[in-house]
Amino acid sequence: MTRHQIESTVRTEYNKYKGTNAKKTRLSIGIGCGTASYEFDLYELNVVIGCISTSSWFNETGTNNTGGQDRASSELSWLSLWQGNESRVHILTDKEMAHRLFKKHSGALFPHSIEIHHFEINTKRFSLIGTL
């Protein structure tokens, strides 16, 4: 499966799991000219906003996938910048990434709670890792 196919599968399964109708949506963050925008993988007005990360913690050679780790961490920043009332969720398809990302950011003071979930693509099951 491609990254886009995996994201689509995760979104479909999340909507079934939570009874939502979240879609991939580009949203403006801020006001005025020069307003930043970001494409969130999950969004349903007044319900949920979220990101899906498909990167693994380690790359194929067994070394740290720093690019993937940085991208997964930056998703937390975008979720923190969002000013809406939606619940925030970050879903990761790599179990190692989900656990290590949660551990890395545990204890940090986020302005809004963000749930970290692992999604097992083979069994289509979600596991809550924790809430930041």
What kind of feature is each model-predicted range?
Residues 30-35, 95-99:
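Acidic-and-aromatic substrate-binding clefts and catalytic sites of carbohydrate-active enzymes
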Residues 5, 37, 70-74:
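Short, well-structured alpha-helical interface segments that form or flank functional binding sites
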